[in-house]
Every structure is written in C-alpha cells, then in structure tokens.
C-alpha cells in the first residue's frame, strides 16, 4: 500500500495509476484477479494492490513506479526529476538492486526491471509448502524468519531459509485450534482477558496476546504491548 499525501490525486491520475498497475501485474503473471484499490481519506489517498505472498517487495516497487509514471506523464516539467529521485532513494535505502537495476520511469524498462525483481524474490519452495498446507486445510503463519503450520500444540515452525520437503512435514501431527479475534476502539484487552478467564473456568488452556503481554494457560510468557501481529503469531505457534 502506498500513502499519497500532498498530491492532487484526482480521478484521472488514479485511473492512470490503476491502468499501469494492471499492465504490470499482467506482465508479471501473478495468478488470480488482484485487487487494485484507491481509497480517499482526509489527508490524501491510499493506493493498494494485492500480490503473491513471496512478491511483496516487488509489489511495493510496482506500486511506486505506477504512481510516479502517472505523475510524470501528467506534468513532465513539474515531475521531471522523479527518476533521479527514485534512484537516489533506492541507493540511500541500501537496496541491493539499486546499482544493477536502477528504478526507471519509462514503462518498458520499468516492467523489465520488475520482472527481474520478481524472479529474484520468488520462493517456489515456499509456495509448494503453502499449497500443500492449504490443500490440507491447515493454517500457516509467515514472518521474516519462520513459517509455521498448524496452531497451538499442533503447530510446527520451520526456518524460512531451510524449508522441509512437503513429504518430510509431519502432517498427521499438525492441526488447528479454536481462535477468536477481538477488534474495536476501546476494551479489547479487557474483553480478551474476560474470554480467557471463562475458558480457564471451563477447563481449557487458552493463550492470548494483548497490550499487557503474552499469556498461555494463565502464565505470563512476556510483558509488554503484544497487541500486534508478532504477539498473535507467538501465541498461535
């Protein structure tokens, strides 16, 4: 997702951005129908596109190029330095591709660059493992270091840098656990604690994460604000 603030993102610009995203997605051969969404808010607009889970860095580059290209075509005199700005930003961020694959504004070199980035980022081994997991209707969780299959006592985690072969996964030992998600503006932690107390009283061993910390069966694993995805993944694993 790309946040656009301080730019006149009118309907014409959004249409140009959307068309470029669609062409790039088609060029990359991403399966299915990607969602391409532009949502206006008080300070600007959010521009989002879905992508395969092993192509997310490429997707951010795609999204940024589509907007910059649309801006450049709308007013080349005002946005003439965009390419240099993108290259400088890539070098400053330490991007490994900045020297060999510098960002481009023109469509053909930009799409060729995205193809190379996508090929470098692709994880066919990870896709095969996820496909096998989903075919068995098991949940999976992924972060920068681990992929886990199953939840709770039925969960196993594997380093993303050394994935097992599908045939070597102990599928019969893996399973899901009942899971509840609590959302809202106020009272989430109180509600989660109340649910956990009810489950303990009923003889279950609930685990939960919240702004107080991580808890399993009434014991504190760690204190602090774990209301985000890290806390949820830790408990579910």
Predicted feature residues:
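Glycine-rich phosphate-binding P-loop
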Residues: 178-195, 199
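Residue-level recognition of alpha-helix initiation/capping sites
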Residues: 123-124, 190, 227-230
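Hydrophobic alpha-helical scaffolding
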Residues: 116-119, 185, 222-225
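ATP-dependent carboxylate-amine ligase catalytic core
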Residues: 172-175, 197-237
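Preference for protein termini
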Residues: 1-179, 201-206, 211-212
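Alpha-helical scaffold segments in soluble metabolic enzymes
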Residues: 128, 132, 194-197, 234-235
